[in-house]
Amino acid sequence: MKAVVLAGGHATRLWPITKDRAKPLLPLGKKPIIEYILEDLEDLEEVIISTNDKFAEDFQDYIDEYNRENVRVAVESQQSEEEKPGTIGAIINLLDEEDIDDDLLVIGGDNYYSFNTSDFLDFCRRKEGPVNVVYDVKDLDLATGFGIVDTEGDKIKDFVEKPEQPPSTLASTAFYYFPRKDVELFHKYEKHFKDTDVPADKYLDEPGRLIEWAHEKTDMFTYSFDGDWYDIGTVQGYVEAMSSVVDGNIIKGDTENSDIGENVFVMEGSTLKNTTVENSIIFANTEVNDSEIRNSIIDKFCEIEDTDMKNALVGEHTTL
């Protein structure tokens, strides 16, 4: 079995924090986001991190630092988000370039999952078709923001992308298993949509469309788990994921006469004086004085003074 970890996006929703760093390499507790995925895949024959040329060296440095002997980097042929081949397009290109002919895991590298991968693989081996990990968001209003799976038992009956009236609360996550015989679904899917009026940037960049199409061609199954799942694409998602993996706040910097609320993460070398902070992440070597910081991420080497900040993303070396 092989795995492809998708890490080629430019994460524009978290810019400027992720403008010059790959989102899967952001710290989550004591290690990068992607490490939570890869440490569970040590027994696989090979894991390929699919990324772009801009971040390829960063991922190679990560592999070397964490001594991931079964992991290597494959570079997508694009530099900007506009040139990106799309999630499905990147997988198809990789299948062609690497001539992959094996059972395959496809995993979003910027997600955090708390389930045990070996349990998931045991489940997959008992099935005779692709499996999509799903998560019950338990709220119909929340379900409108996800690709939603409707099931009959554990078999996929329908898939709807961000429905106004969700048929269930089971959200499709970026974690898929394809047995060797079904890896060809990617090429069949591409061939099908090439003959339609659907723009390539739609059918090659929306994984939900593959599920929507493929479940009518073959039996597809769901694996549901209890625990936590976070798609780390927003400030709130990042803060909630951080809170899930650590016990309480992380305060590695200095605080003086400051009110530290819940879900606060202050990294090495940073200082807070006369400041109120809650639901926020402050990267290393940043100074915050006489301010209120809520639901925000402040990058390294910033100087913030006398500022009321809410729902903000502040890039490195910023002075406010």
Regions found by a protein language model. Give the residues of each.
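Short beta-strand-to-loop element that shapes/binds the nucleotide-sugar donor at the catalytic cleft/hinge
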Residues: 131-148
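Conserved N-terminal catalytic core of the sugar/cofactor nucleotidyltransferase
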Residues: 2-5, 13, 26-27, 31-108, ...
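Conserved hydrophobic/aromatic beta-strand scaffold that supports enzyme active sites
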Residues: 132, 148-150, 175-177, 229, ...
